[in-house]
């Protein structure tokens, strides 16, 4: 192999190594970002504001959204984590205390409320009779407000979950 070809190969390898290290650094930072934040005791004000905006925008479409969970303490999170493991019930979370966006006031869970007042988690329900799933209409609104939907996750689907990191 001549010198220019060797130089090109070495530069390509260095570029790929830099790319790999950048990715690893980004992933490490993302996973540890919550640990660096001070622990709040309520929803972040922007998350609360956007949760209220979500409810209002959904109501304008004839959909009644109920926020079933917001801020959750580390202790409450650990109790949920025990469910299906050391306590009776189904597993409802894979996050221990300190690992959930709920613990930092950055996540909400929602459900739909029918006209009779019952709370449902039915992703196919079309209470406003427009031919679309009310659940997915709410998700669409949430995404425009900056929320990430747990239903888009690859590993564990958490359909009622919405989270955000305010700018």
From Swiss-Prot:
The relationship between pH and activity is given as: Optimum pH is 6.5.
The Swiss-Prot or TrEMBL record describes its family as follows: Belongs to the peptidase M15C family.
Entry GO MF terms: peptidase activity
Notes on temperature effects: Optimum temperature is 37 degrees Celsius.
GO CC, alphabetical: plasma membrane
Q: Which organism is it from?
A: Bacillus subtilis (strain 168)
Q: What is its EC number?
A: 3.4.-.-
Entry protein name: Peptidoglycan L-alanyl-D-glutamate endopeptidase CwlK
Q: Which PANTHER family match?
A: D-ALANYL-D-ALANINE CARBOXYPEPTIDASE, PEPTIDOGLYCAN L-ALANYL-D-GLUTAMATE ENDOPEPTIDASE CWLK
């Amino acid at each position: 192999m001549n010198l220019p070809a060797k130089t090109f190969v070495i530069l390509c390898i260095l570029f790929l190594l830099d790319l790999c290290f950048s990715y690893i650094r980004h992933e490490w930072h993302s996973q540890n970002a919550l640990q660096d934040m001070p622990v709040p005791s309520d929803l972040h004000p922007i998350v609360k504001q956007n949760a209220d905006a979500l409810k209002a925008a959904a109501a304008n479409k004839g959909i009644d959204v109920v926020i079933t969970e917001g801020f959750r303490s580390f202790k409450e999170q650990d109790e949920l984590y025990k469910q299906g493991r050391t306590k009776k019930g189904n597993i409802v979370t894979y996050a221990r205390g300190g690992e959930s966006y709920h613990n930092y006031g950055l996540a909400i869970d929602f459900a739909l409320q029918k006209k009779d007042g019952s709370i449902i988690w039915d992703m196919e329900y079309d209470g406003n009779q427009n031919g679309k799933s009310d659940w997915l209409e709410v998700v669409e609104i949430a995404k425009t407000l900056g929320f990430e939907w747990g239903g888009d996750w690859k590993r564990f689907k958490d359909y009622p979950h919405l989270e955000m990191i305010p700018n």
